[in-house]
Amino acid sequence: MNLKPQTLMVAIQCVAARTRELDAQLQNDDPQNAAELEQLLVGYDLAADDLKNAYEQALGQYSGLPPYDRLIEEPAS
């Protein structure tokens, strides 16, 4: 499956943002939910790995794309 670079960029940013939210929730939430949150984080981490691999391929095919690390940075408040 080939995705457009813009689609990959949006997906990477969304997964990174959700991962940050889940991490924060895991730190601040009721320990009873910890197992569920950790399971969700594993799924998001696997998705992030797949998206990173696809984006690295796109970097080789398209010019002008930002580095992956810039896409996953937490936005300044």
UniProtKB/Swiss-Prot annotation:
Keyword Lyase: no
Keyword line: Disulfide bond
Phenotype upon loss of function: Deletion of Tsi2 is lethal in the presence of Tse2.
Matching CDD domains: Tsi2_like
Coiled-coil region list: none
Family annotation (Pfam families): T6SS_Tsi2-like
Keyword Disulfide bond assigned: yes
Protein purpose: Immunity protein that plays a role in preventing early activation of toxin Tse2. Binds to a large surface of Tse2 and thereby occludes the active site to specifically inhibits Tse2.
Record's subunit section: Forms a heterotetramer with Tse2 consisting of two Tse2 dimers and two Tsi2 dimers. Formation of the complex inactivates Tse2 enzymatic activity.
Record's protein name: Immune protein Tsi2
Source species taxonomy: Bacteria, Pseudomonadati, Pseudomonadota, Gammaproteobacteria, Pseudomonadales
